[in-house]
Each structure stands twice: as C-alpha cells, then as structure tokens.
Amino acid sequence: MWRPSDNKLYVPPPAPVSKVITTDAYVTRTKIFYHASSSRLLAVGNPYFPIRKGNKTIVPKVSGFQFRVFKIVLPDPNKFALPDTSIFDSTSQRLVWACIGLEVGRGQPLGVGISGHPLLNKFDDVENSASYAVNPGQDNRVNVAMDYKQTQLCLVGCAPPLGEHWGKGTQCSGVSVQDGDCPPLELVTSVIQDGDMVDTGFGAMDFAQLQSNKSDVPLDICTATCKYPDYLQMAADPYGDRLFFSLRKEQMFARHFFNRAGTVGEQIPEDLLVKGTTSRATVSSTIYFNTPSGSLVSSEAQLFNKPYWLHKAQGHNNGICWGNTLFVTVVDTTRSTNMTVCASTTSSPSATYTASEYKQYMRHVEEFDLQFIFQLCSIKLTAEVMAYIHTMNPTVLEEWNFGLSPPPNGTLEDTYRYVQSQAITCQKPTPDKEKQDPYAGLSFWEVNLKEKFSSELDQYPLGRKFLLQTGVQTTSFARAGTKRAASTSSSTPTTRKRVKRK
C-alpha cells in the first residue's frame, strides 16, 4: 500500500529574501591615501575608585584594567579639498573613508599592577591546610592583595563594540522566593564604554547585584560590572560594522586557593561523601575560589606599537567608516603599574621617621598614540545602492542630504491662509527636527582628527611603513620649489662612454 512521505515539505518564501552584500560590491577605492594621527593621549587617576568632593569628582578612576574606547571623528570627505577633482562627481557619487592601516602606540614601561581588599572574604587556606577550620567567626575577613589576569586587546569597527556579562535575572511569578535564595542569572549584552572594567579573572558579572557583601572581590570591581567582549554577537552582525578585526592575548594561572566564610546555600548531597567524626563531623565551607595571576609581562609578547593592515575584514564591511566615525577599543594590562605618591603633612619633617607625618596616595597613568592610514573611496548613487544603504543605516543618507519621499496620504490636510490671525485656532509652530546623536548617553574617549589628515605619507612613521609594505608612489600636490624636467620625444638613445680598465 502506497503512503505519502512523512517528511515535511518546506515552501520557499513568496518574496526573495534580501541578501547582505559586502561593501566591495558597491564601493570603489581610489589611489588616494591619507595619514592621520592623534596627539599624545594621557589619563591620570586613582586605580581603585574615584575621589569625590560633594557631588563633584575631583580625581577620576583610571585603571590598567579598564576598557579604553576611542571614538575617532573623521572629516567629511565630501567637503574635503581633494587634489584631483576628476575622481568625484557630486551629482552622482559620494565619498567615504576606508581604514586600511593603524598602529596603537603605548607609552610607559611594562609593569604588573595589583589590587586587593582590606576586608576580603577569605576564610581558610585550602591549598595547604594546617588545620580543619569549621566554624567561622562573625567576621573573618582579612587584607589580601593580588595581581589580575593578563589581557591585551584591540577591537576596530565603525560602531561601538558589544560586551557580555552575567547579571541578576527575573524570577518567574509562580516560584516562591525567600531572602537568601540564589538569584537567577541572565546573560546581558551591552555596549562597552570607556572606563568599563575588563574581566580580571573573577568572571564577567555584575558584582554590585550578585555580591551584596562587597567583600568577595577586590575594591576596584566589588561594586562594578566586569565585561567581556561579545565576540559571538559581533561576528554574527550581518553588516559587520562593530568588528572589522580584533587582536587579543589572554593568560592567567591560579596562584592561591581559599574558601569563603558564610552559610553555604546549597549543601553537599549525602551520597557524595562519608560522614566524619569529632572535628570532621561538620563539613567546612565548600565555596572555593582562587586568586588569579597574569604571570610574567614581556616585550616579546606585545600586540601594540606595531602596524596592522586591513586587507579583508571578517564581516561584510571591509573597513568603511560610515558616519565618518571609527571606534578603537584597547585593553593593555601589561602596563598597569600603580604608582605610590608620598606627601609630607608638615613643612619641615622631623629628623626621625614618623609614619603619621606622611600621606600616601595611589595613582595610575595611561599613555596612547593612535595612527591611521585611510583610503578615499567613492560610491555611485544608484537606486539599488541607495535603497540598500537606507535599509542598512538610514542616517548615512541623511548625512548625504538625501531623503525618501513619504507614501501618499489618503487624508485631506487643512492649511490656513492667515496663520497669525486670531480668528482661527492657534497653529502650533513645527519645531525643526534636531539631529539625534546615535551615541547619546554613552561614554567614549573622543579623538577629533578633522584637521589631522595629510597626504604626505613619507613624513610620518606609519606612512613610511605603509609605503614600504605596498610600494605605493606618493605624489606631492603642494610641494613648493619642486620642478620636473620636461620629457623629450627624442629617439636617440643615451650612450655612456666606456672607460678602459687597466
């Protein structure tokens, strides 16, 4: 007996699904290159917490374990004074920048920064136990310092990077919740902002919500949120704007092993152990943790102070800086030295040392230098390209002074002749639509390069490296006092006089 197949039949969609295409399909690259570099970028602050006076922050928090997110502002190439105007037709084309090379310079010596907590929740040493501690006292917190996980990181894109961390979730309405129950966890994806803390070895999580005792981790993160770049989410971005390419190097080992004081919320199942007697009748705390360490820092394993060239991005955006904006995210914990500053409390210190006569301070400094090579590109404004760009990012067309005609309205609108007349109802003026900042409310380190572009590549270190790598011949468009001899059409070859050697 014949039976139809039990397999499901998948019907294709009635309309074709729009396909994301690479920028190389509609962006034409020219042979014009520019070098741009920032000034020396410096930051100084307290490595553990900001210092506040009233409602004002007088010393910011500056740590070697923070994300540095640079928002690079580029000039509008459509308003640029180009050396060759024949490459661009303003009626049918628009110009964009493509980032093809960069170098992140890092100053300051290599060093290991430490952090700690004067009241860390450490109960017992479970690595080399001399005794079996069972009943912790009311407060067993101790002063512990440690070095963190070692991280070097560089993310480049034309949109802010995304980070992930674990936060406090929402419990279902039908579940009974009591004080002291473990809260549900939720994976949160958010934009990485300048000053956010990186994963230090204790996990990417919201410590303010998930550790209410403020004693389980060091001071600089006990009320902060440590984020880890969401590489999976950024790699899945259909347009590839958030991550052109990334560099990372991470290393860590566990230095010491401790356990926590406090009531264990989830007891060990009875089938996992045999009950003890006397001093082992009560099981000690099984909430174990380790202190991380990033180990040796060396100049042989540095990701910075060297050039990187972008030939093919990992996504569909091959380095095009939409909105004339570029984001460079940097983490470098190999230069996390915390400097101790000492100041005397008296104008004439005593001859013998007295500790109370001196005040001690902690400071951390950061030093950066950003260099870029940009390539000028053009886009032909066809109907298909404009429709695709509008679907991808409508603000791009708005910045190019393009707009879409609204669909026809079926209703009849009223327009009065005398708008200011008191005989008619009040006509409220229509306010001008202000341009909305897509990154309003987010904190970035803004670097303005609108006046830092130069076509003289051979005058800059990164430009000379680019010329050496690519063999591109630069042409000086405004070099005074340089003349070229006129070419001749003579067919007579130039002969050299042979010198007779003895």
Curated annotation (Swiss-Prot):
<keyword id="KW-0426">Late protein</keyword>
<keyword id="KW-1164">Virus endocytosis by host</keyword>
<dbReference type="GO" id="GO:0039620">
    <property type="term" value="C:T=7 icosahedral viral capsid"/>
</dbReference>
<dbReference type="GO" id="GO:0019062">
    <property type="term" value="P:virion attachment to host cell"/>
</dbReference>
<keyword id="KW-1162">Viral penetration into host cytoplasm</keyword>
<keyword id="KW-1161">Viral attachment to host cell</keyword>
<dbReference type="InterPro" id="IPR011222">
    <property type="entry name" value="dsDNA_vir_gr_I_capsid"/>
</dbReference>
<keyword id="KW-1160">Virus entry into host cell</keyword>
<dbReference type="Pfam" id="PF00500">
    <property type="entry name" value="Late_protein_L1"/>
</dbReference>
<keyword id="KW-0946">Virion</keyword>
<dbReference type="GO" id="GO:0005198">
    <property type="term" value="F:structural molecule activity"/>
</dbReference>
<protein>
    <recommendedName>
        <fullName>Major capsid protein L1</fullName>
    </recommendedName>
</protein>
<dbReference type="InterPro" id="IPR036973">
    <property type="entry name" value="Capsid_L1_sf_Papillomavir"/>
</dbReference>
<keyword id="KW-1048">Host nucleus</keyword>
<keyword id="KW-1015">Disulfide bond</keyword>
<feature type="compositionally biased region" description="Low complexity">
    <location>
        <begin position="478"/>
        <end position="494"/>
    </location>
</feature>
<keyword id="KW-0167">Capsid protein</keyword>
<feature type="region of interest" description="Disordered">
    <location>
        <begin position="478"/>
        <end position="502"/>
    </location>
</feature>
<comment type="similarity">
    <text>Belongs to the papillomaviridae L1 protein family.</text>
</comment>
<dbReference type="GO" id="GO:0042025">
    <property type="term" value="C:host cell nucleus"/>
</dbReference>
<dbReference type="GO" id="GO:0075509">
    <property type="term" value="P:endocytosis involved in viral entry into host cell"/>
</dbReference>
<keyword id="KW-1145">T=7 icosahedral capsid protein</keyword>
<dbReference type="InterPro" id="IPR002210">
    <property type="entry name" value="Capsid_L1_Papillomavir"/>
</dbReference>
<comment type="function">
    <text>Forms an icosahedral capsid with a T=7 symmetry and a 50 nm diameter. The capsid is composed of 72 pentamers linked to each other by disulfide bonds and associated with L2 proteins. Binds to heparan sulfate proteoglycans on cell surface of basal layer keratinocytes to provide initial virion attachment. This binding mediates a conformational change in the virus capsid that facilitates efficient infection. The virion enters the host cell via endocytosis. During virus trafficking, L1 protein dissociates from the viral DNA and the genomic DNA is released to the host nucleus.</text>
</comment>
<comment type="subunit">
    <text>Self-assembles into homopentamers. The capsid has an icosahedral symmetry and consists of 72 capsomers, with each capsomer being a pentamer of L1. Interacts with the minor capsid protein L2; this interaction is necessary for viral genome encapsidation. Interacts with protein E2; this interaction enhances E2-dependent replication and transcription activation.</text>
</comment>
<keyword id="KW-0945">Host-virus interaction</keyword>
